[in-house]
Regions:
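Residue-level hotspots at or immediately adjacent to binding/recognition sites across diverse folds
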Residues: 1-151
Length: 151
């Protein structure tokens, strides 16, 4: 298996392989305008997928992905505006999943894990100012997120 997008200016931050012939790697293009990036391994080669980002995103980076099958993945990251975002894969395309933090402050979810398509947990941080940073978690039930502060 060769590295995705060899020679391109990209950063890959997370990977999930639901089978030996299916892997998804997520990250961002490392350009001034930025943009989320998903690479998919089909057992023979990597291919790029486009992902939607929130309308007001100033920079988009997917930080983590978790796949329960080749047809079900959830990826989380940072949209550069005051907010986090998530994308889901349904086997044919990526779709934006609405998500907010508890305080509406700048945030980034950096990890996600899914036990099933309807049971995922994400972890990250939000901050209004450097001195007020705090951890946050969110739980996905397949329909919506429930955000909670961590201890």
């Amino acid at each position: 298996m060769s590295a995705p997008r060899s020679g391109s200016l990209v950063g890959l931050y997370g990977v999930s392989c639901p089978s030996a012939t299916s892997c998804f790697a997520v990250g961002s293009t490392l350009t001034k305008s930025g943009g989320s990036l998903v690479e998919r391994w089909n057992g023979r080669a990597w291919s790029a997928s486009t992902t939607p980002v929130p309308r007001n995103a100033s920079f988009a980076a997917l930080q983590s992905v978790s796949c329960t099958s080749a047809a079900r993945c959830l990826a989380v990251g940072d949209d550069g505006s005051p907010g986090v975002y998530a994308d889901s894969w349904n086997g044919t395309g990526w779709h934006l999943v609405p998500m907010t933090t508890t305080g509406g402050h700048i945030g980034a979810f950096s990890a996600v894990t899914c036990l099933a398509a309807t049971s995922c947990a994400a972890l990250g941080a939000t901050t209004q100012f450097a001195a007020s940073a705090r951890s946050e978690s969110a739980f996905w039930n397949g329909t919506r997120w429930k955000v909670a502060r961590t201890a």
